Amino acid sequence: SSLKVGFTEDFGVCPVDAVVREAFRTRVAALEGRVALCEPVDLALTDDAHRVFDILRAEAFLAAYGEAFRSAPESLGPNVRANVEMATAITLADRAWAHLEQTRIARRFARAFERYDLIVAPVTPVSPFSWTELYATEVDGVPARNYYHWLSLTYVVTLATNPALSLPCGRDARGMPFGLQLIGRLRGDVALLSMAQALEQAWAGDAALARPVPDLAALARSAVDLKAPVTHPPLEGKVAAGAGAATAV
């Protein structure tokens, strides 16, 4: 293949668990023999990327939920309220800086794609966790700054606005499904899908790299009584007082 690939475990600014780094390195090693070039890429990101995303996200939440926050704050969940509250503390100077910095980030990605056809990274920084946990509270021993901080491997790509997808790619050392994040050139959605399909087909015959398939026989019998109410978000199997029976369907 003539494909030129740049890879990064963490974009230089994202915490990532050791089990994910190990799984990612295995996939990179598998790529090296199939492409013309596979080397580390430095996108020159700094911790400012997190602040940029905080500001732009808060700005979007204020636009969407500002009126509800002012008139009926009790109608919003705690995470939405936290995002809107963050927005109320942001200045015009903060917004101007964030938009300029986002442009700089987009240009760094554009420069990288002058050399590479594809950039790969992990999708998430942690192995899949229990559905009863709403988000990862820490990554690699680092406490999360907020409920979405653990998604930084993908939101730094969102800042660049490049197309990206998750390619299911075997399992990690814990036996949990692993995803490879594939990032393409700006407006290169079709080319990205084509590269993803080629990789998926190339690895389809390798049990360690192929898309994990659920064991339907093992899942056929539920370990819990599916007739019981399922709360969402999970409340340790209980329904909040006065809330009624909230179900998953």
Labelled PLM ranges:
Residues S1-T8, I55-A110, P122, V126, ...:
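Short helix-loop capping/hinge segments that flank enzyme active sites or metal/cofactor-binding pockets
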Residues W97, F129-W150:
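Short, surface-exposed loop/helix-turn segments at secondary-structure junctions
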